[in-house]
Amino acid sequence: MATIQVKGQPVSTVRVEGNSRPLNGKSDVPLLLSFPHSGEHYPDDFDTNSELPFEILDFPNDKYVDELYQARSGLDLLSIHANFPRTYIDVNRHQHNIDVNMMKNGEEWYGRIHPSGVKTGTTLFWSKTKEVFDIYSRKLNHIELKQRLAQCFVPYHQLMTYYIEQIYQNHGKAYVLDCHSMTQFDGKLRGRKQRPEIDIGDRHGQSCTPEYTECVADVFSSFGYDVKINGRFLGGEIILRYGWPEINQNILQVEIRRDLY
C-alpha cells in the first residue's frame, strides 16, 4: 500500500473500512461509500505558504463527513477513505485537470492538460483556498506532483475500481454514494447564493438510474431536509468515472450542508 510521511511516520494514503467479504465473493449489499475529501493527515512534504493559517488551508476538506455515515459499520458496508487532504491532491478531479501556471515549466507536464477551475484554484492540485488565499509561495516541480499522483490518486482509484468490480460481479449491479459536504453559501465568484441543505448530483441522469436518485432524495426528504437534485453540484470525476447506469453501475454524489452538523 502506498504511504505518505506524516510527522516522520508512514501513513497509508487510502484506507478501506467495513466488510471485506467481497474479496471472497460473498458481499451481501451491493453498496460502496466513497470519502475522497475527509482526509486529515497532512504530509510532511506539503510545503504550503507559511503565512497561510491552517484553518484556511483545512477549510475545503469535508471534515467529519465520514462520521455522519457511522451507521455504515452496523450495516457491514464497505467504504473507501482518502487519508490526505484534498488541497494536497484532489482525487475528485481528472488527472489532466492541471493549472500549468503553478508549476515550473508547466508546459512540459508529462500528460495532457485540460484545466478547469483555474480561476478558483481548484484543479487537481489546488493553488488557492476560499478562492483568494494562495496555498503555495513557490512554483511546484513535476517530480513532486507526479509523486502525489502515484502515491495518492492512483491507489484511491485502483481501490474504487477493484471493489466496484467485486460488487458488480457478485450482484450484477453496483451502487456507490460519493460523500461530501458544502458550505451554506456559494463563494464570492458565484454571488454567495444560499445552497440547498442536501444537493444530490447525478450529472442529469448520466451517472445512475432515476430510481436510485429518487430513492436517495426521498430518504433525505423524509427527514424534512431541503433536497435538490443537480442543484449546485452535478458531481465530479468520481461519478464521471464510475457511473454507468447503462450496465447498472450507479453512483451519486451527495453534498450535505455543513451548518446542519
Model-assigned labels for residue ranges:
Residues 2-176, 181-260:
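N-terminal catalytic or cofactor-binding beta/alpha core of small enzyme domains
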